[in-house]
Amino acid sequence: MDYETKVFPHTGGYGRYNRVVVVFSWFPNFAVMLNLFSDVFYTVIPDFYHCKPDPRLLPSAFLPSNFSRQGYLNLTIPWLNGSGLSHCELFKYPPNASDFSEKLSRQRVSCTVGWEYGQVAGLHSNFVTEWDLVCSDFWKIPLQHICFMTGWILGYILLGTLCDWLGRRRCFLLSISLSSLLGVAVCLSNSVVVFLLLRLSQGAMLAGVFLSSYIARLELCDPPHRLMVAMISGFFAIFAELLLPGLAVLCRDWPVLQAVATVPLLLLLSYWCCASVFPESPRWLLATAQIHQVKRSLQEFSGRNGVCLRDEIYPGETLLSEIDSAYGEDCRPAYSSVLELRRTRVIWKNCLILSFTLFIGTGIQYCFTRNLHGYSSNFYFVYFLRVITGALACIFICLSVDHFGRRGMLLLSAIITGLSSLLLLALTQYLQGGLVLVLSVVGLLFSQALAMLSAFFACEVMPTVVRGGCLGLVLAAGCVGMAASSLMELQNNSGYFLHHVVFASFAVLSVLCIMLLPESKRKPLPDSLKDGESQRRPSLFLSRPDRDNLPLLCARPPSSDYNPDNYSRLVSATRRMLTKDNLPYRTAVPTRSPLLSHSETQGQENEVIA
């Protein structure tokens, strides 16, 4: 049964109640992104840090009171040309030394009593300074980000499948409950290992919150409003990014910032009590043939939208009786999983292509942001420039995608991203700093647009019965791209050039792949696997509709006045009317004994006439 044309309009369409539910679905996006981007502040390395002086490495005749603070540091810590005091080494003097001139042979050793740090991007302490993750322990910083992204990958895959089995609401409530509890537990971490495991687990649950709210939001909209609803949720994410630096300055310590970021998740637990602010998706209920639940859901939506499901004679029976006649009384729920994509041709191809484009969109951003770091080492310059380009990407999608189509704008974003990357790769040493900055900003803008549009496009073209699992696979590929930057940092950026070459090549290759995608602009969401398989890519070049029209060979079916929809509606209404005892009128018919034959009946009529 077609939900978009036969069910959705009769429940009020994108009415008042649908709008209210969509508004409440934006708040989880803010809470999730607040916890996601706080990871940037947890792992940023201070610009200034050095070893703490160790008196045990100094000779017994040394008196610190005879030296100034800077002189004391110069005697105990090596000075590196161009970078100031050494980050990881100390001077060790002979025990009986009395001459502290540079001619004295001094041994360089690793730090022994810890480090002294400057202020960390608004925070006084973070994950790095809490456990001294510098020098030989630097590798634990990218490892933390890899663990966090691994949690998101597992969450997208597992909870995406769970979203198709349990429903959008149940998956959301399960994820929000566990993510809030894990967020509180992260504040109490007492070691690096505990912090890594808790962040991995919380990332998995945050992925479930984001995925379930994203899908539920789009399934409650009609085609003209889907894009704007999705992009407004993106602005909520941007607002969370803009708010984080101020929160970091106010909180000062990372456990306090983590607690503040967890508060919105705790507030979302109120969705347990208020089922009306985040109801189950009626589209998913109908697609999985949960007839009793979908009837209650449709009645709730129609009532809150101010529309009654009414028949010409009996209220509330036209749409519901059509559902009964379409599915039958003994219909059992039927659930699907992403494993069924093995039997499809179009759906898995679309899923693979959009996973590839999202992987490129997130992975190639590291190449552009690294050029920004080369232009300015200021943390806030790169951070706010990234936020501004994200906002511009949202605005670009809002203004262009509904006019030129999803596929066309995705293709344009991939082309500009690839060109920017190739120009930076080939001409960086020949370009001035301003041109490098412009190309990096343009590439960052369109790579973010590529990532946003890939996720939105995937949610539109995947069928309802496997939308959670398929979108989870696509978003998981995006997290793999985000984790690729940490892999480069784990190798001390030794493979950056190869990383840039690979992603630039992938961006060019994605241009060809995008041509194979269908167009979903102003089209209903597919519900079944059959609907997903029926999607076809539009022709690359426009052609006349009657170009291949041969009238003599055209076999048109004879016109008929028969309409199966009207007939089924008439049959269902008649059946309902005949089963009622209190009919609106009764037809008076003469009583006739069933035992009388036709001849006896004719004789009785002649006697009456005589």
Task: Identify the role of each PLM range.
Residues 46-108, 112, 228, 250-326, ...:
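Central mid-sequence intracellular linker of multi-pass
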Residues 167, 188-193, 251, 427-430:
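Helix-breaking motifs and short loop linkers at transmembrane-helix boundaries and internal kinks
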Residues 33, 37, 199, 234, ...:
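C-terminal transmembrane bundle
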